[in-house]
């Protein structure tokens, strides 16, 4: 198998290491040449992915920010051809799929939206791990839901990464869910850590503090773009969250033990 990786950050780098460990030939593109050179020197990448060899890939994984994903695919679509399956790995799906599905159709390319549900609070190729996706879910957004053979092919192509299960959904449904399951956690954690009290936490914090703050350490550029790409869904979830916080605050302000107890019980 020959796999093309576009972007060698945490996600793309982990895919490169996973497929290399599985015996695949890995070709990669990265905006920073020094990262690509390091990846080749470390053995995770066998060569550079270019417009001349992209059509020879069985699978192409795009691990860039949403806007960069669309730009790369628009620029390369004419060179990809009918053989490779192209899957993007961005954190939101509506903007990417709305732009890339028509481009793919115009050039006879097989393109699917994707979102590997795995990661860490760290970024960059230096933190990439071959087992990052082991046991993780993979969300796939196809252009239509009639091609069962394509679904099976995608599963087989992604099997070396170690995903435990696959979910096939629409871009709209994906973005609605991801606002709650991922983006909310990041924005709430990031806001929580801004309390002046956080500077004095040592000696007074344990597991709950660690759990609450882990994802506050994020890439500001990437997450800002993802939040704005999905702002309608994220703002909806934030409004619900802030309304519930207000209920807790009001109950405490009134010394209302029964109401506070009920609220805490409902949230378990």
Which residue ranges define each predicted feature?
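NAD(P)+-binding Rossmann beta1-loop-alpha1 motif at the extreme N-terminus of oxidoreductases
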Residues: 1-51, 55
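Residues at the starts of beta-strands that form the adenosine-phosphate
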Residues: 2, 25, 110, 137, ...
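Short beta->alpha hinge that forms the Motif I/post-I loop of the SAM-binding pocket
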Residues: 31, 64, 89
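N-terminal Rossmann-like NAD(P) cofactor-binding module of classical short-chain dehydrogenase/reductase
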Residues: 60-61, 87
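Rossmann-like NAD(P)(H) cofactor-binding subdomain of soluble oxidoreductases
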Residues: 74-126
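Internal alpha-helical scaffold of NAD(P)-dependent oxidoreductase catalytic cores
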Residues: 130-217
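Interdomain hinge/lid region at the active-site interface
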Residues: 200-268
């Amino acid at each position: 198998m020959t796999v093309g990786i576009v972007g060698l950050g945490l996600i793309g780098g982990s895919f490169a290491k996973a497929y290399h460990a599985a015996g695949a030939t890995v070709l990669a593109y990265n905006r920073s040449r020094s990262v690509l050179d390091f990846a080749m020197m470390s053995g995770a990448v066998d060569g550079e992915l270019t417009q001349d060899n992209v059509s020879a890939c069985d699978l192409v994984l795009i691990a860039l920010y949403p806007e960069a994903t669309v730009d790369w695919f628009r620029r390369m679509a004419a060179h990809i051809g009918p053989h490779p399956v192209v899957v993007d790995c961005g954190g939101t799906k509506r903007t990417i799929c709305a732009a890339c599905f028509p481009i793919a159709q115009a050039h006879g390319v097989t393109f699917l939206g994707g979102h590997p549900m795995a990661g860490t609070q760290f970024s960059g190729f230096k933190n990439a791990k071959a087992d990052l996706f082991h046991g993780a879910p993979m969300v796939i957004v196809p252009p239509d839901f009639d091609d069962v053979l394509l679904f099976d092919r995608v599963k087989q192509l992604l099997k070396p990464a170690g995903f435990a299960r696959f979910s096939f959904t629409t871009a709209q449904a994906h973005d609605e869910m991801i606002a709650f399951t991922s983006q909310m956690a990041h924005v709430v954690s990031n806001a929580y850590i801004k309390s002046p009290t956080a500077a004095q936490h040592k000696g007074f914090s344990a597991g709950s503090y660690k759990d609450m703050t882990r994802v506050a350490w994020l890439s500001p550029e990437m997450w800002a773009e993802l939040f704005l790409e999905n702002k309608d869904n994220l703002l909806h979830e934030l409004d619900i969250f802030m309304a519930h916080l207000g209920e807790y605050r009001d109950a405490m302000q009134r010394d209302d033990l029964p109401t506070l107890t009920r609220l805490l019980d409902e949230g378990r």
